[in-house]
Amino acid sequence: MKGSKNQLLIAIVLASAYLIHCKQFVTVFYGIPAWRNASIPLFCATKNRDTWGTIQCLPDNDDYQEITLNVTEAFDAWNNTVTEQAVEDVWNLFETSIKPCVKLTPLCVAMNCTRNMTTWTGRTDTQNITIINDTSHARADNCTGLKEEEMIDCQFSMTGLERDKRKQYTEAWYSKDVVCDNNTSSQSKCYMNHCNTSVITESCDKHYWDAMRFRYCAPPGFALLRCNDTNYSGFAPNCSKVVAATCTRMMETQTSTWFGFNGTRAENRTYIYWHGKDNRTIISLNNFYNLTMHCKRPGNKTVLPITFMSGFKFHSQPVINKKPRQAWCWFEGQWKEAMQEVKETLAKHPRYKGNRSRTENIKFKAPGRGSDPEVTYMWTNCRGESLYCNMTWFLNWVENRTGQKQRNYAPCRIRQIINTWHRVGKNLYLPPREGELTCNSTVTSIIANIDAGDQTNITFSAEAAELYRLELGDYKLVEITPIGFAPTSVKRYSSAHQRHTRGVFVLGFLGFLATAGSAMGAASLTLSAQSRTLLAGIVQQQQQLLDVVKRQQEMLRLTVWGTKNLQARVTAIEKYLKDQAQLNSWGCAFRQVCHTSVPWVNDTLTPDWNNMTWQEWEQKVRYLEANISQSLEQAQIQQEKNMYELQKLNSWDVFTNWLDFTSWVRYIQYGVYVVVGIVALRIVIYIVQMLSRLRKGYRPVFSSPPGYIQQIHIHKDQEQPAREETEEDVGSNGGDRSWPWPIAYIHFLIRLLIRLLTGLYNICRDLLSRISPILQPIFQSLQRALTAIRDWLRLKAAYLQYGCEWIQEAFQALARTTRETLAGAGRDLWRALQRIGRGILAVPRRIRQGAELALL
């Protein structure tokens, strides 16, 4: 029975120890390689030294880091803050450089206009099909088939700087750009179209639109992830070849429809970015085919300025020829082969639903008529002028359509009133500048909508913003989240921090993500180095950014880009201080591994330290962060309260604290309290005594009249000796006495104090005498329990000692037996080897003996 009780007790103790050991607590790790999607402003860097690049971008120094991550990450070219910022910023660049005329209506005056009824120059009604591949005539300004546009010559008078004088001006307009009172006759009164919605805010000087190359960079504390998978299509599948970078690649500022020009993503293959939910696509063309486009606006025209007031000008262009705004673009390269490869690539795409074996069912198609000009025609910008090109002949040429005109060039015209490509609205620009305009571009991509079915149509699109989905769609912006939670069996970190001599371990900021693909256990071993790398990388990037800002004094103008760059300087420090403030609120400031007393909330959710990365673990427990953070803050508040109470107790442990000046002030305060209490008690006692004497019929001592200063005569009994008079005899009917009341009163107070202290002593003695019998059984029971526990521990220690001795003897016996066995086996083996050796040595002797016997 006793043995079963011992076994039960041992089982309970072991179970308790197991439960205590298996209890999981929240552990805070600082410096883990994890991240989450972010949407903060990026800053740009460029090598262009034009006005916009100098003011609004930092100089590019080509000093950027990249590291490969062993992780799998999801990318989306459309739901992407990097591409959205690129679209917004390039739009601001376009508006800043081209400077549309807005505010203050420029030409809202009546104009006397003459309509020019024009026809096609060199147009023939023959049905013969002409295929033109030679562009020499286009370069020589003798293109046949280009029509003269319907123009309206207008004359109007306006006042300039001299307000009392009017001046006559001549301007040529497209018929669609003006509104006339009488549209049937050749002479009519006309007004500029959109007169009420277009106004001027600044000088409408002509500006060149020179494309610039720039890159985006992430602020310190953030990073850019890039997908290097060749099968990535802009939305899926998840990317397994991920690279972390501080900046993007260089990209070109593109503004066009239908085609993308001078892109940086062109490779020796054709690939397609396809939106995950609709038919929007961006097709990157193979640069092997050398696809180029050359545009030209010939002519030498005179441009006269109209000055409204100081600083405001509008340029007027007299009509000199019949095609003042005519231009054309011709295409060179292996276009037909490139378009055929596009069809073949589309047929192999996983999203394609048509017949994969028949590419002849895939056709290139122009958008329907009746849409905005930017949709109907290919719109591009050439040196600040907006060209609208009719691509019908070009599509006939690349598709080899029989029965229709096929030419490798397209007629274009320059417009002043254009639709904005990023926001809904219209902008008014100045008439074309004088002189010849030429621009050359490399065609690198196609913007299209794909309608798959029995007949698959690749319809060219006017979504100019799609160009940046291709340029930056393989990037994503992430925020480094170095703080992580995980359950461990350690409840509290109480050991002193040991400082070891370590070498400097700085990999730069991106080196912090170097262990992103490692298991949690392996990454946790380098948290100290990781946290130092994080801070060192932040400081390094801050210093680099500060240096380039100092070199760029134009940043003080605080333009849109300048504000972003200045904001990027403080983002990382704010992030680092925020992380440290959060760690401090949990009691984990400046610790890489911080054990807490907060229990882990979900026992079924535990990390796989050997196979799971920190990024995977953070994605699983991200929904618990708010609750864990609140619990850690509450635990830290309670810990601070406990530490405060403990420090109050510790102040009494050191004897020198008793002699401290502040302690003596406190002692004096306590003494004053005691004196005040005694005085108050004495007053109460005196009042009680006075009332008792009044009840006996005597007046109190202090009620004597002032005339009785020396003594009070009291009759007393003659037979009673004076030495036996006591306070109790006062009030007796016999005799009278003399009582010097001041001295007697002091004696009376002393007797009362002695009686009070004696009473308190008696009460305490009685209380202790009554408590002692009550506490004695409790102490005896506690002593018996401690004795039993001591005996039980001695018994278990004896059992453990006996077991250890038995195991030791068993090991000794095993070692002795093994030694003897090995020794015997060695001796037997040695004897066998000796016999074999003697036999081998005896072979010649046996042979000789055999030969002798044979000879005998």
From Swiss-Prot:
PTM notes: Specific enzymatic cleavages in vivo yield mature proteins. Envelope glycoproteins are synthesized as an inactive precursor that is heavily N-glycosylated and processed likely by host cell furin in the Golgi to yield the mature SU and TM proteins. The cleavage site between SU and TM requires the minimal sequence [KR]-X-[KR]-R. Palmitoylation of the transmembrane protein and of Env polyprotein (prior to its proteolytic cleavage) is essential for their association with host cell membrane lipid rafts. Palmitoylation is therefore required for envelope trafficking to classical lipid rafts, but not for viral replication.
Q: Sorted alphabetically, which SUPFAM superfamilies does this protein's record hold?
A: gp120 core, Virus ectodomain
Q: Which InterPro entries match?
A: Gp120_core_sf, GP41-like, HIV1_Gp120
Look up the record and give one Gene Ontology term from the biological process aspect. fusion of virus membrane with host endosome membrane
Q: Where is this region: V3?
A: 295-328
Return the annotated region ranges for V2. Answer: 154-195
Q: What is known of its domains?
A: Some of the most genetically diverse regions of the viral genome are present in Env. They are called variable regions 1 through 5 (V1 through V5). Coreceptor usage of gp120 is determined mainly by the primary structure of the third variable region (V3) in the outer domain of gp120. Binding to CCR5 involves a region adjacent in addition to V3. The 17 amino acids long immunosuppressive region is present in many retroviral envelope proteins. Synthetic peptides derived from this relatively conserved sequence inhibit immune function in vitro and in vivo.
Q: Where is this region: MPER?
A: 648-669
The task this protein performs is described as: The surface protein gp120 (SU) attaches the virus to the host lymphoid cell by binding to the primary receptor CD4. This interaction induces a structural rearrangement creating a high affinity binding site for a chemokine coreceptor like CXCR4 and/or CCR5. This peculiar 2 stage receptor-interaction strategy allows gp120 to maintain the highly conserved coreceptor-binding site in a cryptic conformation, protected from neutralizing antibodies. Since CD4 also displays a binding site for the disulfide-isomerase P4HB/PDI, a P4HB/PDI-CD4-CXCR4-gp120 complex may form. The surface protein gp120 is a ligand for CD209/DC-SIGN and CLEC4M/DC-SIGNR, which are respectively found on dendritic cells (DCs), and on endothelial cells of liver sinusoids and lymph node sinuses. These interactions allow capture of viral particles at mucosal surfaces by these cells and subsequent transmission to permissive cells. DCs are professional antigen presenting cells, critical for host immunity by inducing specific immune responses against a broad variety of pathogens.
Motif Di-leucine internalization motif location, chain numbering: 855-856
Q: Which gene encodes it?
A: env
What is noted besides the main data?
Answer: Some HIV-2 isolates have been described that can infect cells independently of CD4, using CXCR4 as primary receptor. These isolates may have an exposed coreceptor binding site.
Residues with glycosylation annotation: 37, 70, 79, 112, 116, 128, 133, 142, 182-183, 196, 228, 231, 238, 262, 268, 279, 290, 300, 355, 390, 400, 440, 457, 602, 611, 627
Please indicate which superkingdom the organism of origin belongs to: Viruses
Q: Which residues form a coiled coil?
A: 615-636
Q: Which residues lie on this side of the membrane: Extracellular?
A: 23-670
> In its keyword annotation, does this UniProt entry include Ribonucleoprotein?
no
Q: Where along the sequence does the record place the motif called YXXV motif?
A: 698-701
Region annotated V1, chain positions: 113-153
The residues that cross the membrane are: 671-691
Region annotated Immunosuppression, chain positions: 566-582
Protein name (record): Envelope glycoprotein gp160
The annotated region (V5) lies at 455-460
Quick one: a GO cellular component term?
Answer: viral envelope
Any one GO MF term held by the record is: structural molecule activity
